[in-house]
Amino acid sequence: MIKRLIGKLIGQKPAKASNPLRISVEEHDIDIRHISPCATRIISTLNQSGHEAYVVGGAVRDLLMGYTPKDFDVVTDATPEQVRRVFRNSRIIGRRFRLVHVYCGGDLVEVSTFRAPHETSNTQDPKGRVLRDNTFGSINEDAIRRDFTVNALFYDMRTEEVLDFCGGYEDTRQSVLRIIGAPAQRLSLIHI
């Protein structure tokens, strides 16, 4: 039983994402009204400013599994500086992984930019820990940079579709936690 669990955990998915599986509103159980008004406003404003923006990660996973998310993260093609210009009540944080905290009312939403594979030359310390990770990329590249398939799900509020680049939708339905890519490499990047 333990071997099977470990096998499921370290099971590899392709490290190349191409066109996503698009799960329509008729196929998934996400009710758009369950997404925080703050995240909804941020995504809508970014879309109106000409940017792509999605709910991403744990919130999408939780909504698909019937849970109430503890927070909502947004990912976009806008750089942190562009996000900051769109939202006056925001602030860029982080050196290693720059993102933007956008405040609305008493809520806080983290807005990150799509990430691309990073260069290892001078971005890691001698122990292999990532020091800087601000290489921006596409939604496809961002998906394969995430830790688990169930955290690489994107919710498009315009179409109400879930975009799945790594098999995370099926993994949520099967209650499987699967690492994306090579487990040893991926786990070395996760800092708890």
Predicted regions and their residues:
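Catalytic cores of the polymerase beta-like nucleotidyltransferase superfamily
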Residues: 1-189
